[in-house]
């Protein structure tokens, strides 16, 4: 199938693009500049240089495709992009896979797709855009909701890996808040697999949470990182005000959410089988270990 893809050179997109190609799909990536276009071509896909807020361009590319996967989601992009895609795909029944985010659900010890929304300020803009995709007539619109994505030494896990370590005779790694909050997590390659499954088999109007099933606390992750960094597992809590000052109020509010999720629906409905290493394993002996050892 011919797929229009945004965000192809981003963190998640860099795993989605090769997986789509491996599955035999033809991919056209909408990218912002020629340097990104060359990366896409080198990977074996076609590229169009343009702006995701160019409604006429997006509608034409969507019309020419067999469906769309939108990874480059943003508050300043989504309203125009979604409207253009729905225009281009109108009445076709073709798939449109949009990107959500786990923070939309707020603090919750057992997040499922139908859990109530309680987003932090940072992601409050998502709801209306997701509703537009899920409620579209004549389009097989679905939303993949990544939890905190990690892997390949990148992603939000770097806020733990690169956290301040203090000084003195017994330096300690700085936590985010007191570290008691759980994070729902998923490996980037597992997220990529779910996007492909949602495109191929996802049902119209459905949401699929991408959660690998491990929900460690930030303190647990911090202690592992502190051991890998040669700090004997020493960590230091900080106040909410300190976290906000260090990371910015918006990101701090989101990272302080206490969230747990399992991703059960995607497993049952789409046959998704996340099998990437856990974030804990990645910190101890995987893709984040070299940075911890040398920081």
Q: At which residue positions do the language-model features occur?
A:
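Amphipathic terminal alpha-helices
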Residues: 277-295
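Mid/C-terminal beta-alpha module of Rossmann-like enzyme folds, strongest
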Residues: 194-251, 291-295
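N-terminal Rossmann NAD(P)H-binding glycine-rich loop of SDR-like oxidoreductase domains
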Residues: 3-25
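A conserved pocket-lining segment of Rossmann-fold NAD(P)-dependent short-chain dehydrogenase/reductase
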Residues: 162-186, 190
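Conserved C-terminal active-site "lid" loop/helix of NAD(P)H-dependent oxidoreductases
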Residues: 219, 244-273
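Conserved beta-loop-beta element that borders a ligand/cofactor-binding pocket
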Residues: 130-153
